[in-house]
Amino acid sequence: MDIVILAAGCGSRMCSTTPKILHKLGNAPIIKHVLQLADELRPKRAVIVTNAAVNGPVAALAGEHNLRLNTVLQGEIAGTGGAATSALQALKNPSEEIVLILYGDTPLLDKATVCHALDRLSSGAKIVLVAFKSENNQYGRIVLGSSGNVLEVSHGRDTNGLAVSGAIAGYRQVISGLLGGLSCRDGELYLTDIVQSAAEKNVEVGYVIADERKAMGINTRADLAIAESYFQCMKRASFLQSGVTLTSPDQVFFSIDTQIAQDVIVHPYVVFGAGVAVEPGAEILSYSHLEFCHIKKGAIVGPFARVRGNSTIDRGCVVGNFVEIKESSLGEMSKVKHLSYLGNSTIGKNTNVGAGTVICNYDGRNKQHSDIGNNCFVGANSTIVSPIKVGDNAAIAAGSVITEDLPPRSLGIARSRQTTKPEYKTRR
């Protein structure tokens, strides 16, 4: 099977300078979801039709997958029919009979639905549409004959009949031949017009029925919001089924690549940004925001914690309230419980970082790195001016501003000595 992805539309109804397929769904561009589906289907070849505005970003996203993806620009003929023609021409020396055409703005279509359509091909149909029930009048509708055969796809504003998603599976030679016979409407070729042409030539057209939420296209911000809501519902259901505890599922938000193992507990109002993996037994408390980080077994994060920038929280660690960790690693059983910022640092095992500790990692031009060893104690309200190395079993006195390395088992004190004036209040 070969796959064609049509992603050259301008998306003017999004009212945005950002191309439609690059808007985010599940914290990833819409088109990434379609590329992920294509990757799961393991086609022999794949072609994506884009425009100049998205060609570079799409090529970069395609590189994240194992697809043999050929990117071509929309040809002179506008419309989905023109795009499909350009794509099929790019698939030179065809070796596959079947071609699957996907739309770049239909991100939630799943493998099961596509496989159902492909199975329908094997039962006699030459072209198979993906249809769904919808009250939304923006979609084309399947028109059936008296015997139940597909006659055409109507583009009126009514909501009678099944809507079509645009995705089509079929035999390459059949689709190519039908595309070649289409006429332009309003200066464009419409891919769905091949349905009427097929019916006129007694070519059997079938359809499979999908869930509207999976088959919907995204054309407006409202559509994007609906798709995001359903994406989150699917993610929540998947994690609950796999053994993750979500104490209030509707208040937890995931990304396309979120990985959470069984026996993790997630409390309300947690946001998982891109690139997060959480190992078994960890607990994420409310109002925490995680992105590009690895939370290992038994760690506790939050509430009100932010972990980001390729950070690692090791086994049994505690990251408490109002703590931010960026581009840092926290060793096994270490704790940073309150009101702290750790940036560009490596913290060893069994180290305690006191409340209000700040690692000053930016010198005005570059980020600097600090290392704190195993079994260290960092007193409250300490400031560590990177780059600093603190040896194993060392301690930093509360309120210190550390600007020099500390050898193992040493105590660093960097603050003014206290002055006490007896009876000061009485004299005044």
Swiss-Prot record:
Name the record gives this protein: Bifunctional protein GlmU
Protein role: Catalyzes the last two sequential reactions in the de novo biosynthetic pathway for UDP-N-acetylglucosamine (UDP-GlcNAc). The C-terminal domain catalyzes the transfer of acetyl group from acetyl coenzyme A to glucosamine-1-phosphate (GlcN-1-P) to produce N-acetylglucosamine-1-phosphate (GlcNAc-1-P), which is converted into UDP-GlcNAc by the transfer of uridine 5-monophosphate (from uridine 5-triphosphate), a reaction catalyzed by the N-terminal domain.
- Indicate the enzyme's highest-level EC class: transferase
GO cellular component, alphabetical, reads:
cytoplasm; membrane
Native source organism of the sequence: Anaplasma marginale (strain Florida)
The keyword Cell membrane is annotated on this UniProt entry: no
PANTHER family per UniProt:
BIFUNCTIONAL PROTEIN GLMU, NUCLEOTIDYL TRANSFERASE
Lineage at the top is: Bacteria, Pseudomonadati, Pseudomonadota, Alphaproteobacteria, Rickettsiales
Pfam families in the record, alphabetically?
Hexapep, Hexapep_2, NTP_transf_3
Cofactor(s) named in the record:
Mg(2+)
**Reaction(s) catalysed by this chain's protein:** alpha-D-glucosamine 1-phosphate + acetyl-CoA = N-acetyl-alpha-D-glucosamine 1-phosphate + CoA + H(+); N-acetyl-alpha-D-glucosamine 1-phosphate + UTP + H(+) = UDP-N-acetyl-alpha-D-glucosamine + diphosphate
- What EC number(s) does the entry state? 2.7.7.23, 2.3.1.157
GO biological process annotation, one example:
peptidoglycan biosynthetic process
Q: Give the span(s) annotated as Linker.
A: 222-242
Complexes and interactors: Homotrimer.
